[in-house]
């Protein structure tokens, strides 16, 4: 059976931690920044964990857990 291909667009947006959690970066931080406070912009810099309902779908896109 051939190897499964990693979807490169997903590999750029998500990464898998050592414990297996899938992390994503938050949106809304690069457009219309003038209207947002510094505190809100700092919160957008933090990584978030992917929701459980989306986890299985993302695992199919990055089968080898690309970091």
Swiss-Prot record:
Listed under GO cellular component are:
cytosolic large ribosomal subunit
An annotated GO BP: translation
Instruction: Keyword check for Ribonucleoprotein, yes or no.
Output: yes
Gene3D superfamilies with a match to the protein in the record:
4.10.410.60
Q: Which Pfam families match?
A: Ribosomal_L35p
Q: Which InterPro entries match?
A: Ribosomal_bL35 (IPR001706), Ribosomal_bL35-like (IPR021137), Ribosomal_bL35_sf (IPR037229)
Give the SUPFAM superfamilies listed for this entry.
Answer: L35p-like
Of which family is this protein a member? Belongs to the bacterial ribosomal protein bL35 family.
PANTHER family (UniProt xref): 54S RIBOSOMAL PROTEIN BL35M, LARGE RIBOSOMAL SUBUNIT PROTEIN BL35M
Return the protein name: Large ribosomal subunit protein bL35
Gene source species:
Dehalococcoides mccartyi (strain ATCC BAA-2100 / JCM 16839 / KCTC 5957 / BAV1)
Gene from which this protein is expressed: rpmI
């Amino acid at each position: 059976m051939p190897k499964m291909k990693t979807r490169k667009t997903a590999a750029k947006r998500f990464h898998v931690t050592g414990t297996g959690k899938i992390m994503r970066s938050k949106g809304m931080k690069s457009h219309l920044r003038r209207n947002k406070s510094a505190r809100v912009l700092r919160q957008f810099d933090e990584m978030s964990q992917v929701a459980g309902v989306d986890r299985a779908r993302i695992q199919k896109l990055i089968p080898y857990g690309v970091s």
